[in-house]
Every structure is written in structure tokens, then in C-alpha cells.
A protein has these predicted regions:
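Conserved HGGG/HGGXW glycine-rich cap/lid loop of the alpha/beta-hydrolase fold
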Residues: 7-67
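Active-site loop/oxyanion-hole signature of alpha/beta-hydrolase fold enzymes
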Residues: 42-46, 56-96
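Short beta-to-alpha linker loops that shape the active-site pocket of alpha/beta-hydrolase fold enzymes
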Residues: 58-62, 128, 223-225
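Conserved hydrolase catalytic core segment
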Residues: 94-130
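The alpha/beta-hydrolase serine catalytic core
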Residues: 131-188, 250
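Short beta-strand/loop motif that positions the catalytic acidic residue
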Residues: 188, 194-196
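Conserved alpha/beta-hydrolase "acid-adjacent" motif
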Residues: 200-206
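Catalytic active-site module of serine/aspartate enzymes centered on a nucleophile-bearing elbow/loop
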Residues: 217-253
């Protein structure tokens, strides 16, 4: 299992296929890791491996994964972007597509902000976002589903650090995508495709807002997971959306 190291951060990644690069991260909140793919709504590493060079990774400090590093209390979304862009640098990749499931919608927003000249197109699949009726749902998810196992293996990390980390992830911008503002998405001209969901951690309104605000965004039908024929057409729409945006110099190769 390949790893890349940058200072005191170690990232485990996998890749398959060939063609224009597609960085794709699974769901799971702060436990986003490669081993989650078999339970995803669809396994992008499998369905797109004949179309793109598919790259995935364990996110930093995900329980059950092999990526480790400091807890970036002061700049958590920036740190995730550092890890993701650092992996692309390590692989010698300049331009790429990005597709993020669940928490990956927040990753997508930050990558689009940090590297607009590198992310050629982005797909938001069942993105997390702020839910006004339950504004602490993601904070609670992290505290219940990530913290207990994480602190068992990292006794040097204090509860105060963890509380500050979760606060800075989900309460600094307690609206929309957490990682970027509505104003940023409104001005983002990168092509975006949105696959909505409608559960407390993946509010339908967040997906609608991304698709409504971003000037070059599209959104699929909803619901799209059933029947199987509709789900397959939705997956093919993602494929065609990305293929149509491969830079000409790469498409000609």
C-alpha cells in the first residue's frame, strides 16, 4: 500500500486505471478512508477505472486508515487540502478532476478555492452541509463516531484540542459547506456536478444551494439511487460530465 510523507504527515493512497487523473474521496466524515469504498453508494474506483486514472486516499487521522499527522486545530480544512494537493504533487499531477462523497463536498469547496488552476471540474456526491434544524449534527457525528477510537491511539491529544478541532471544522462557518462561503461558490467558475442526498448529515438544501449559486454547476435528478436503471444513468452522467471536460491537450493523447 503506497504512502507519501510530508514532514510529520503520512498519507496512504491507492490508484487504478489510466487517463486523466480523478482524485476521489469516500464518505465517512472524519473516518473517510479507502476501506469504505465497498459500502459507498457506488464505488467510483471501480466504475471509473476504465475511464480515468483514479486516485483515492485515507484522510489524515481517519480511524481504521493509515494516514496520520498532527491534529490541525487552527486550520482543519486547509490541512485536508494540503494533504490532497500534496498527494497530487507527489504523483507528479498538475491538473485533475475531484469527486468527493459526504465530507468530500467540503473538501471540494476548499480545493476549488485553493487550487482553481488545478481542479478542472468537481463532483459533489451527497455532500454534507449545515442543517438549520439540527446545526450540530456534524459536530455530534465527529464526537460520537471519530473521537472515541481516535483518542485511544493518540493519548497525547487532549480533549480540549479535540473540542477546538471540531469547533473549527463545523462552527466557524456554521452555514452551507463549512469550508467555504456562499460568496466563494457564487464566484467559482469551475464546472461542478451535484448528486444530492437528503439525510440530516447530507442536507438536500446544501446540494441545491451549491447547484444554484455556482455559475457553471449542474445537478442530477433526485432521488437518483433507485431504481437501478436510474442510478446507472446517473453514474454515466458523471462519466460524461468529466470526459467532456478533459483538457484538449490530454484528450488528444
Amino acid at each position: 500500500m503506497p504512502l507519501y510523507q510530508r514532514g510529520d504527515v503520512r498519507i496512504r493512497y491507492e490508484e487504478t486505471g489510466s487517463g486523466f487523473p480523478l482524485l476521489v474521496t469516500p464518505g465517512g466524515g472524519l473516518n473517510s478512508r479507502v476501506s469504505i469504498w465497498p459500502t459507498a453508494v457506488f464505488n467510483a474506483m471501480e466504475v471509473f477505472k476504465n475511464d480515468f486514472r483514479c486516485i483515492t486516499m485515507d484522510q489524515r487521522n481517519a480511524n481504521g486508515g493509515e494516514s496520520t499527522g498532527p491534529v490541525p486545530v487552527d486550520n482543519p480544512w486547509e490541512a485536508f487540502a494540503d494533504d490532497q494537493l500534496g498527494l497530487m504533487d507527489h504523483l507528479g499531477i498538475r491538473e485533475f478532476f475531484y469527486m468527493g462523497y459526504c465530507i468530500g463536498g467540503c473538501f471540494a469547496g476548499k480545493l476549488l478555492q485553493r487550487a482553481p488552476d488545478r481542479v478542472v471540474a468537481a463532483v459533489f456526491c451527497q455532500t454534507v452541509g449545515h442543517l438549520p434544524q439540527d446545526p450540530r449534527v456534524m459536530y455530534r457525528h465527529g464526537k460520537e463516531n471519530w473521537v472515541p477510537d481516535f483518542i485511544k491511539g493518540r493519548p497525547e491529544v487532549s480533549i480540549d484540542m479535540i473540542e477546538a478541532y471540531l469547533h473549527n471544522l463545523y462552527a466557524i462557518q456554521p452555514d452551507f459547506l463549512y469550508s467555504v462561503s456562499r460568496e466563494f461558490i457564487r464566484g467559482c467558475r469551475t464546472p461542478i456536478l451535484v448528486l444530492p442526498d437528503d439525510v440530516p448529515a447530507h442536507p438536500l438544501q446544501t446540494s441545491i444551494d451549491v447547484a444554484s449559486l455556482a455559475p457553471n454547476a449542474e445537478i442530477t435528478v433526485f432521488p437518483w439511487k433507485e431504481p437501478a436503471e436510474l442510478k446507472n444513468r446517473t453514474i454515466d452522467r458523471v462519466r460524461r460530465f468529466l470526459q467532456a471536460r478533459i483538457p484538449m491537450r490530454d484528450a488528444a493523447q
